Amino acid sequence: MAGLQRLASHLPVGVMLPHNTTEAPGPHSAKQDSYEQGDSSQQSLKGHLRNNFQKQLLSNKELILDKVYTHPKWNTQTKARSYSYPHCTGISQQDPESDSQGQGNGLFYSSGPQSWYPKANNQDFIPFTKKRVGVDRAFPLKPMVHRKSCSTGEAGTDGDHNVYPRPPEPREFSSRNFGVRNQGNFSVVGTVLAATQAEKAVANFDRTEWVQIRRLEAAGESLEEEIRRKQILLRGKLKKTEEELRRIQTQKEQAKENENGELQKIILPRSRVKGNKSNTMYKPIFSPEFEFEEEFSRDRREDETWGRSQQNSGPFQFSDYRIQRLKRERLVASNNKIRDPVSEPSVEKFSPPSETPVGALQGSARNSSLSMAPDSSGSSGSIEEPQLGECSHCGRKFLSFRLERHSNICSRMRGSKRKVFDSSRARAKGTELEQYLNWKGPASAKAEPPQKSNWR
């Protein structure tokens, strides 16, 4: 058995052991017959060994063909077409006599796909295992099939599972045919890919343009909304300012009317006094009434000139001018209120009774800035000097109608003693040092003045 196994391992692929005893030489024929008759179990073992060897070769070739033909339907078809000879091997196993006869006639069965052809008629046929120039038959090239054509072919054959497309023979895949087909497939695929890429680029460009347009439209709408909102706010503010200006203008007009009425009340009695020639009274130049009249007339002239020059000016400039004028009027009114109590005694002094004309001369002489009127009694035209009085507090000399006011102010200034701030007492407040300073007294608390430096 070990010898048979070694022999089978060294045999070539397409060669099988002969079983025809007639081809053996004559002297060994008797021995062979006795051997066949005596040991049938050895023949059965030999047949089993041969069958196992053929099966192993078949399985190896199936694996190689599975790698070459990837399409499942082609794979099954090639298996069906190329490996139909196991039936023959089974027949040979079942009928060893016919096998021996076939071998006797010169027919041999090989393990390849051409095993069922007779050897004599197979001279023109090139075996599959023989190599040709430029093509490796052990590893042929895989067919290039486009996936679309594959999908259509599969879709067309799904209905009928028994009908398979005839796969191309291995010899059909030559280098020239493969190159032509490959170029055609690449050209078709390139055109399709270029078209799809162009469509995608156009779609992406249109989409980006649409997105940019939408963004610009949204930004424009937001800007318009913001402008509308600001316009509404500005209109509201403008209405408020106009109402405020109207209110200020009405207030100013009312204040002006009130001031005019007060002025008429003040001026009418003075004009009546002036109209009375018998009771002539000389009004001092610097009296508060004269100043007020002068300021009022000046303001009126300014208002007239301003109104003529600013007729076409804006409302804001006009309102500013009105506000300044109102402030000025209030300031004048406050000054008048302050001067009223001072002017009353001076008026009384300037208006003595009419029975004594000498008193009128005396009162008129008290004003240093006013010229003296001639005496009504026809006395001499000599001008009397104004009478001066001395202040009891400071010793200065003043006119009699000013002396009283100065004396009041001077007495207040002299009588008020300013309290000097003592930082040492402020620091000692609330401590035992304060008690000590109070016990010691203010005389001792006074610090001696620093000595004058005479280093020069």
Swiss-Prot record:
Assigned keywords, A-Z: Coiled coil, Metal-binding, Zinc, Zinc-finger
Biased composition (Low complexity): 368-382
ZnF C2HC/C3H-type span: 387-416
Coiled coil: 211-265
Intrachain S-S bonds: none
Binding residues for Zn(2+): C391, C394, H406, C410
This protein's record includes keyword Zinc-finger: yes
Protein name: Zinc finger C2HC domain-containing protein 1C
Source taxonomy: Eukaryota, Metazoa, Chordata, Craniata, Vertebrata
